[in-house]
């Protein structure tokens, strides 16, 4: 695991070693074991290294035999052994045993198709000097991050935004990114909160071609997409396609097939030259991973859990039960309101606003694990591929609700939702009813957004400040060459190009609709799961895991996102992921069948709980001074983005226990670092 960074300069420009060094310093936490930079007159590639495979010899960047092709990567390639054998048989020679060392040779053999051969999590940078070509590639599911910025003097890239900002890239707020963040509580790619700094999308490749007829040119192409479901019969058989065999006709056969794929995924993710531990929440995803890895491990696995004093949020008893059942060496940490001290650390780790409060728990459990091991497995991704979110049950219920008389869904249900007292408890009934009452009146995709939406389009319009001259750039502005320049001396705001109340070029729903339209041939719930896999999984869940773990020099591997398993499950009809109404709407029925002989029955059939932090109660208690200070009207007025009166009303509504959900208040906490 590493942090990677670098630059390719335009003709006539020179590489500034100080800027490159600043990038490496900004990523030192991602690779505390080693750091190195390769440079010629046109390109510089650097890596900070956390040594997992070939601990002593696996330095990056690496080259081919004559030094003409250079590569570095952040991640792990689980099939590097078989790829090395194939390349060695073709005459390639390697400098070390590390997985990165094969990349220049694989590129020589397969050209731009080389990512298709890789099994693992990776963000790769490769410089082909003879062709004047830079290649950036990101893994299929977006497990490892990669960012880039095209500027007046070249293309800069890095694992984290902070490394690009360290070069002095001109800063301006990306208006559309802010608009989407307010609805989602994270910034969805390919945008970042900084205009001109972009995220390379999962399963895509960026190619910088210096030899293009009209000068250096950039192209981004998709090299992997989620396979189509193709079709499903009433018996649940999905027809094969793209060379895939038909699925078994029986549920028992399907369970056996998925069990084999799961075992293969966990085994592949255990490849390491250092001990591998595991995060354990007590939910079915991480519990299945731990149960399988303990069966495969040569000794007792170390597991790590986090809990809370608030019993409605605490899952330590369930994690402890699984640990005892599997025979692991178990470690626990408890999150308390003093975690407010972490706010600034989290802002530094994420570089841009990120309001998923579970990042606090992730930070603390990663810190605990990093004191014992360099690598852990986690159960992340299980909800998106097996069908684990409660909102999928809401999607099924809403489909029925839309067939009921309108007075029930548009008058009676909203009235009931308004009558339920506000609550700070986890999975609060008042918030769930409010969101369902709103969503049942919408089309399926709009409802799917509504189940999680923080600020609606209407609410965002009331939240923005009046036009104020703050530096705000739209996506269209950010793409203009005049706005891509390097200005080392300036972190100042740029002149306004859009009035704040009309920040966005599009509503947030359009982002989801594009992902939904890109996956047309599937059952309804499978299509919605594909939307989540391409947006919230990448930019919320996996971003959270990467930043909180790498801040502590810890590698987290996600076997439930092993691409052969993901591609298999994409073909499985949605009735095996979220049961229909008449069968009880159980979540993850297929995974529960797989887990039946691995875990205690109460763990297998335990309802979905989720990993949440008791922020609502904290913000009324120990964290109240933080809330009222950060969102004080005068401070909000100075920032110039939000209407101070609107923000103050939200704060007061929360503190007084009225209707507004807590996300309305804590959501705005991190924005102070951007504007």
Regions found by a protein language model. Give the residues of each.
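Conserved adenylation A10 loop of the ANL superfamily
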Residues: 282-286, 379, 665
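Cysteine-centered catalytic environments shared across enzyme families
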Residues: 1-350, 362, 366, 491, ...
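Short, flexible loop segments at the rims of nucleotide/cofactor-binding pockets, characterized by
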Residues: 351-356
